[in-house]
Regions:
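Extended, hydrophobic/aromatic-rich amphipathic alpha-helical segments that build helical scaffolds
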Residues: 1-21, 48, 114-119, 196, ...
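An aromatic- and glycine-enriched ligand-binding surface/loop that stacks and positions planar moieties
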Residues: 2-170
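Detector for Asparagine
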Residues: 26, 36, 102, 128, ...
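Active-site beta-strand/loop architecture of penicillin-binding DD-peptidases
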Residues: 170-220
């Protein structure tokens, strides 16, 4: 921004970040496990976390995400900010990204962290009413595209589709709007982008008294790597070596 002395702070950021990266050179390969694990002690890339324990310190976030009480959602701008699988933004990508003509195209070939933060689109059949766990595939192949994809990138009790509420009732689809919800008032949003970052099915969600005990990451080496990359870029020193130390992890 043309301020004097800025390089002093950028140089220090790069130096300090590199020291941390030397001690913690890798990130955890399963992004969603960082936010949905009962124990973060020893997990790759975790620098500091907050531990929760039954009878001592608990929270209700995991349950809330799977109820109608959650109003955590994203904007279209937030969705568009995620890169595509070729490393390019949506404005210049050569991937299969399909723009915003429909939700399937909008989510296609995107950074997997998008899928693990904002629920991808899908649709299933619910033949026995909204308050049941049963479901079937529709006759439209697109409706199962992300059901199949999530089964390959997320663990069985993490971000699998179709999603379910705190009682195990299967949600018919996403986008799932609060004011047009197929008789299912849960796992819904106002704008169509339901945030499910803290969603999992291995944590007990039937108790409304805030008894969840998944640990919370406070500082991750991934954040340090981004700081390093940005500082090196501002200093005009970002090259392949810097990329391989940071954003290519």
């Amino acid at each position: 921004h043309g301020l004097s002395g800025a390089d002093t702070y950028l140089e220090e950021c790069a130096r300090a970040s590199e020291e941390v990266i030397k001690q913690y050179p890798n990130v955890h390969p399963k992004y969603d496990e960082l936010f949905n694990s009962e124990i973060l002690d020893g997990v790759t890339g975790i620098l500091l976390y907050k531990a929760y324990e039954t009878g001592q310190l608990m929270h209700g976030l995991t349950r809330m995400v799977r109820t109608g009480e959650s109003y955590i959602e994203a904007t279209k701008d937030a969705v568009d900010s995620y890169l595509c699988t070729d490393g390019r933004p949506v404005s210049t990508t050569t991937s299969r990204y399909g723009g915003d003509k429909n939700m399937y195209g909008q989510f296609r070939d995107r950074d997997y962290r998008l899928y693990l933060t904002i629920c991808p689109p899908y649709m299933v059949k619910k033949e026995n009413g909204p308050s049941t766990a049963d479901w079937k595939y529709t006759d439209n192949a697109q409706d199962r595209e992300f059901i199949d994809l999530m089964a390959t990138i997320s663990g069985e009790t993490y971000h699998r589709l179709p999603s379910s509420n705190f009682k195990g009732f299967t949600v018919q689809g996403q986008p799932h709007f609060k004011n047009m919800n197929w008789g299912q008032g849960w796992n819904a949003s106002q704008m169509g982008f339901w945030v499910w970052k803290y969603y999992n099915t291995h944590t007990v969600a039937t108790n409304a008294n805030g008894v969840n005990t998944t640990d919370a990451p406070l500082f991750r080496v991934g954040e340090v790597m981004v700081n390093y990359a940005e500082a090196m870029c501002e200093l005009g020193k970002f090259d392949q070596t810097a990329a391989d130390k940071s954003i290519n992890k």
